A protein has these predicted regions:
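Cross-family detector of peptidyl-prolyl cis-trans isomerase
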Residues: 2-9, 13, 18-163
């Protein structure tokens, strides 16, 4: 009987380093349930009565300036725009406005949310979009953007230089 007890203790003791290392792994913000709930709540708080419309994949958008009439880009176009990207808490992660320099990008090379929203714009329009993680940088993230982050953008279409 003592041999069984010693064997059982040996098994438990040998597993302790594995359990300790699993518990010591830091939980990043994208792994926290409360953080994920806040990301979803930010999307749910935007209402149609406030001018928000739905696009594919749960992307929300609204026009804040302009009429939507005039030349519109397609996925094959290059676009020049000003933009500001923030997290749901308002913290800025990127802004061409801050740099005081518009950005020019091939539309097809941008995140899926932008590929859907920017073609809804005419030159001179400004929109806001709320981007669920799946339509932005996904579960892994990129640079300062953590995986699972809902992103908010203000986008102003200045030109379609590819035309």
């Amino acid at each position: 009987m003592n041999r069984k007890l010693v064997a059982a203790c040996a098994v438990v003791l040998s597993a302790l380093p594995l359990a300790a290392s699993a518990q010591e792994a830091p939980a990043g913000p994208s792994q926290d349930a409360g953080w994920h709930n806040a990301q979803q709540a930010a999307l749910a708080s935007r209402q149609a009565s406030d001018g928000w419309g739905w696009l594919e994949g749960g992307v929300l958008w609204r026009r804040v300036a302009g009429s939507g009439t005039g030349p519109r880009p397609t996925l094959d176009d290059t676009v020049t725009l000003h933009y500001a990207g923030t997290f749901i808490d308002g913290a800025d992660f990127d802004s061409s406005y801050r740099r005081n320099e518009p950005a020019t990008f091939p539309l097809r090379g941008l995140i899926r949310a932008w590929q859907l929203a920017v073609p809804m714009m005419a030159v001179g329009d400004t929109i806001e979009i709320a981007v669920p993680a799946a339509m932005g940088y996904g579960p892994v993230g990129r640079g300062p953007i953590p995986g699972g982050a809902t992103l908010l953008f203000k986008i102003e279409l200045l030109a379609i230089p590819s035309r």
